[in-house]
Amino acid sequence: MDLASKKNTANVGSKEIDPIKPKSPRSSLSPFSLKLGDNVPRNPHFDPKKMDPLVKHQPPKSLEPPPSTRGTNSEGDLKHNTYSSDGDSLAMRKNAPKNLHYDPKKIVPLTTSETYSPSARNHHHHRTKSPDKKRAPRHNGDYAYGDNLVGPSAQPFKPHTGGDVRWDAINSIASKGPQIGLDNFRLLKRLGYGDIGSVYLADLRGTNAVFAMKVMDKASLASRNKLLRAQTEREILSLLDHPFLPTLYSYFETDKFYCLVMEFCSGGNLHSLRQKQPSRRFTEEAARFYASEVLLALEYLHMLGVVYRDLKPENILVRDEGHIMLSDFDLSLRCTFNPTLVKSSSVCSGGGAILNEEFAVNGCMHPSAFLPRLLPSKKTRKAKSDSGLGGLSMPELMAEPTDVRSMSFVGTHEYLAPEIIRGEGHGSAVDWWTFGIFLYELLHGTTPFKGQGNRATLHNVVGQPLKFPDTPHVSSAARDLIRGLLVKDPHRRIAYTRGATEIKQHPFFEGVNWALVRSAAPPHIPDPVDLGPYAAARGKTKSHGGGDHCNSMKPEPLVACAAGPTDDTAYIDFEYF
């Protein structure tokens, strides 16, 4: 594929995606997937396993599409396309930017419920060579097209969860029936609740696996005009494959509810954990650990064109092993975005030169499920000897969707960025403002602009300068980073242009091995949670003829199907919101 043909896509601006404005159906443009053995255009850096999930690949005209396994409903196929704010499907535009690294497996299928276990991924290659052996399906349930909730019925491969026993449990049940649904789970206890749903501790019948199931009431969402928020969260979760972000194991719906099945984090959230610390604050070493993992998660989200917009300790969950996981994506903003690779020396000098393809692919570390589009200019192609191949400068991944704009007033008052309060429109820089508030709270035990009420808090955010108390004492590096993040003008805020790359290089994170953060020892390991009493009480309730009342929940407020005490104070110290 000639990269020169894509030079005009380098300056494509970020646009907020509106997934509910499809045009009239065009049955002739139904999407289909390429098989790895088909005549895929040859390219020395073409990797069908690492491509952009937002743009559909268009095969050569001579290539006949394989028989579709998704049915022939062209309207359903059209709903699978990604739509821009002007209503056009990005997949159907004739001038849509082509992507060298498109992966058909990252486009999640619409109506099929057949997929495969990540733990069996290594065996999948051998099975495909033998036509006599059938693949073991993994069923995640079908999606309905009503109420604007459309999308995938099964998850793509998640490389970092390849050995996850929860996938094995899901697959063992999926192989026995047509699809996974609410009847396959027992809801043991309500763990938390939020604006669009409640989260329950659930075990998968016939296995020893437990999950966190987010249940959203359809009628409540429709009456409060929040269907789009539920759809956004589900779509974003289906894209994620990162150790500090949640894995969507299954999605299904009933007549009354939408259900998302995710990982159960027994360690609670960082807000609760901070309350248990001496003086209700973390040490600088512990704060650096949690901030580094959150920073990597935000960087990955920005690579995908996702602005998180709801960072706060309550949304940072602690896994069993002590590492963190971001949660609650219903306020997030999706946009089209093309990350690029640049030389660090050029960025620092303001040159912003883009690397040529060969050096960028071979010399840059990138997430296992994402390979950014390479956008070389004429200058970098002609002056190949000047691209820094023989120098000591290392490449940087520029993954900051600075052009995206939203006018929504969303977030928690103490964490709202000034540009949101002023109604000026906001972009990815709001995540770096909230990251500064987050770091301040970890170190000081409170937020910097908190007032007597919400109105006073908003006034302080916009009009009051940042101040540090005399105690507790924090390092000058920590204060300097927080000052850079809490600049009220988003254009002057640290990381506005270079994103997480600039923050990683700050002295506060000196000594952090970013490639091995996942292997670092956490400052706190949660105590094991004994789930036996909940399961035993649940079985006792059923044996007394109570029936499976947890699977017959009423609309909002949802019934707390807890096996045991029903008061909220008795719940496990865990919130998903």
UniProtKB/Swiss-Prot annotation:
Residue ranges annotated for the AGC-kinase C-terminal domain, each copy included: 510-577
Polar residues bias (residue ranges): 1-12, 69-87, 110-120
Regulation: Activated by PDPK1/PDK1.
UniProt organism field: Arabidopsis thaliana (Mouse-ear cress)
Keywords in alphabetical order: ATP-binding, Kinase, Nucleotide-binding, Serine/threonine-protein kinase, Transferase
Region annotated Disordered, chain positions: 1-151
InterPro entries: Kinase-like_dom_sf, Prot_kinase_dom, Ser/Thr_kinase_AS
Similarity field: Belongs to the protein kinase superfamily. AGC Ser/Thr protein kinase family.
The protein's name in its UniProt record: Serine/threonine-protein kinase AGC1-5
UniProt-listed GO biological process terms: pollen tube growth; unidimensional cell growth
Subunit organization: Interacts with PDPK1/PDK1.
Disruption phenotype: No visible phenotype under normal growth conditions, but pollen of the double mutants agc1.5 and agc1.7 is impaired in polarized growth of pollen tube.
Positions of the catalytic residues: 310
Role played: Functions redudantly with AGC1-7 as signaling component in the pollen tube. Required for polarized growth of pollen tubes.
Molecular-function annotations in GO: ATP binding; kinase activity; protein serine kinase activity; protein serine/threonine kinase activity
Compositional bias annotation for Basic and acidic residues: 44-55
Tissue and organ distribution: Specifically expressed in pollen grains.
Catalytic activity field: L-seryl-[protein] + ATP = O-phospho-L-seryl-[protein] + ADP + H(+); L-threonyl-[protein] + ATP = O-phospho-L-threonyl-[protein] + ADP + H(+)
Enzyme Commission number: 2.7.11.1
Amino-acid positions noted as binding ATP in the UniProt annotation, renumbered to this chain: 191-199, 214
